[in-house]
Amino acid sequence: MSSRPVFLSAADVQDHLRSSSLLIAPLETALANFSSGPDGGVVQPVRTVVPVAKHRGFLGVMPAYSAAEDALTTKLVTFYEDHSATSTVPSHQATVLLFQPSNGSLLAVMDGNVITAKRTAAVSAIATKFLKPPNSEVLCILGAGVQAYSHYEVFTEQFFFKEVRIWNRTKENAEKFVNTVPGEVRICSSVQEAVTGADVIITVTMATEPILFGEWVKPGAHINAIGASRPDWRELDDELMKQAVLYVDSQEAALKESGDVLLSGAEIFAELGEVVKGVKPAHCEKTTVFKSLGMAVEDMVAAKLVYDSWSSGK
């Protein structure tokens, strides 16, 4: 009989995954393996989404297996767009299940919110390492939610920017962000003000219509587009999507789930894993967009790191 699975809370996960920077090296390997097809040993179907139309939400199921890691996980994630700003329940909630791949036994049930925030930010940092213009000085973050914090953390660890700007739909949340994070961040009153002249832009909003327009973006800038994870949602306008060199985490997922890609008709140039492998170039001299939908193999890497760390210290 298998032993009882361990439960790792958000605090436990945070203890064993203190920085997104810990994920960068293993995630680069996982991205390269994913983009290697069957030879990479990653089995990852596109996420299954169950709409909950009555309550304006959905449930997503994201399984993955990696032969290189010999790890098997699935993440259950919910998103409810009408949550109140004063609600104690976040708009996104996630739980990750880690299995023993040799026999299917459940090893751990762990909070997935910290994992999602940190692995997403780490992948954005990987994309930025390859795609940002040389001598980037200005970082702009659009949005002030959980992902804004995790991105700020890893970006200020991995890169040096002379100026960091933030814009958020509600100024109060931008002020909270500025008063919470270390370092100096300038609040901007409009998206246009925030992005003008920025070298690296991160969009982590709940927008369903474009908020970032190509005419505002500095030629050669790099954009990490994190929000708009449904086929009818967008953060970026047609002009930006079509003028930029477009990179994605998964081409299959982007062509099924990304409104930014589908509604603009933009052509995907490469998966990020292909750039990591060196089989596709990083056009850092051009305007680039990395459209991140998030992948189950990323959750798997983070969950295994957390579980291995917990196991070694128990």
Swiss-Prot record:
Protein name, per record: Ketimine reductase mu-crystallin
Q: Cite the Pfam families for this sequence.
A: OCD_Mu_crystall (PF02423)
Recorded family membership: Belongs to the ornithine cyclodeaminase/mu-crystallin family.
Disulphide bridges: none
Coiled coil feature spans:
none
InterPro entries documented for this protein: NAD(P)-bd_dom_sf (IPR036291), ODC_Mu_crystall (IPR003462), ODC_N (IPR023401)
Question: What is the stated purpose of this protein?
Answer: Catalyzes the NAD(P)H-dependent reduction of imine double bonds of a number of cyclic ketimine substrates, including sulfur-containing cyclic ketimines. Under physiological conditions, it efficiently catalyzes delta(1)-piperideine-2-carboxylate (P2C) and delta(1)-pyrroline-2-carboxylate (Pyr2C) reduction, suggesting a central role in lysine and glutamate metabolism. Additional substrates are (S)-cystathionine ketimine (CysK), 3,4-dehydrothiomorpholine-3-carboxylate (AECK), and (R)-lanthionine ketimine (LK) that is reduced at very low rate compared to other substrates.
Q: What class of enzyme is it?
A: oxidoreductase
Catalysed reactions, as listed in the record? L-pipecolate + NAD(+) = Delta(1)-piperideine-2-carboxylate + NADH + H(+); L-pipecolate + NADP(+) = Delta(1)-piperideine-2-carboxylate + NADPH + H(+); L-proline + NADP(+) = 1-pyrroline-2-carboxylate + NADPH + H(+); L-proline + NAD(+) = 1-pyrroline-2-carboxylate + NADH + H(+)
**Molecular function terms, GO-annotated:** thiomorpholine-carboxylate dehydrogenase activity; thyroid hormone binding
Q: What is its EC number?
A: 1.5.1.25, 1.5.1.1
Alphabetical keyword list: Cytoplasm, NAD, NADP, Oxidoreductase
**Subunit architecture:** Homodimer. Binds the thyroid hormone triiodothyronine (T3); T3 binding inhibits enzymatic activity.
- Can you say where in the cell this protein is located? Cytoplasm
Any single GO BP term: thyroid hormone metabolic process
Q: Which domain of life is it from?
A: Eukaryota
Q: Which gene encodes it?
A: CRYM
User: Which positions in this protein are listed as binding 3,3',5-triiodo-L-thyronine?
Assistant: 47, 257
User: Which residues are NADPH-binding?
Assistant: 91-92, 119, 144, 146-147, 168-170, 173, 205-206, 292
Q: How does activity depend on pH?
A: Optimum pH is 5.0 for the reduction of 3,4-dehydro-thiomorpholine-3-carboxylate at 37 degrees Celsius with NADH as cosubstrate, and for the reduction of (S)-cystathionine ketimine and delta(1)-piperideine-2-carboxylate at 37 degrees Celsius with NADPH as cosubstrate. Optimum pH is 4.5 for the reduction of (R)-lanthionine ketimine at 37 degrees Celsius with NADPH as cosubstrate.
GO CC, sorted alphabetically, is:
cytoplasm
Q: What is the lineage of its organism?
A: Eukaryota, Metazoa, Chordata, Craniata, Vertebrata
